[in-house]
């Protein structure tokens, strides 16, 4: 389970944060991700270890994810995991918030080969 936790945290660090709308709600993470992407029990384990409740929503295509995010107000989700080619599209449209790496205490554990890919 710990290996998956590290992978989830790494994915979270590399995923995009949609805004700081939920920033005052430090006990809840609004997470929008691919269907069947997270193993059963992992989010419950995350909550048990951190005390942070995860509100988990899923999508089956980038198009569905994108359309939903375009209709929602900024900050509907804290964490979204689109495919690489959609990240660039969303970046160009101002839909991505920069990640403050200084707040990621385990950032140094991420594989440098996976960072700053075009």
Task: Tell what function each PLM region has.
Residues 1-9:
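Bacterial N-terminal signal peptides that target proteins for export
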Residues 66, 88-118:
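Hinge/lid segment of periplasmic solute-binding proteins
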Residues 9-17:
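Bacterial N-terminal signal peptides
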């Amino acid at each position: 389970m710990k290996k998956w936790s590290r992978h989830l945290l790494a994915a979270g660090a590399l995923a995009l944060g949609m805004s700081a709308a939920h920033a005052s709600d430090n006990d809840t993470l609004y997470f929008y991700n691919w269907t069947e992407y997270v193993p059963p029990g992992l989010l419950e384990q995350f909550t048990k270890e951190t005390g942070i409740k995860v509100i988990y929503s899923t999508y089956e295509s980038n198009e569905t994810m994108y359309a939903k995010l375009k209709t929602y107000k900024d900050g509907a989700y804290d964490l979204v995991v689109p495919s690489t080619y959609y990240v660039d599209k969303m970046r160009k449209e101002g839909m991505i918030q920069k990640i403050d790496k200084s707040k990621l205490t385990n950032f140094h554990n991420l594989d440098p080969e996976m960072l700053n890919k075009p």
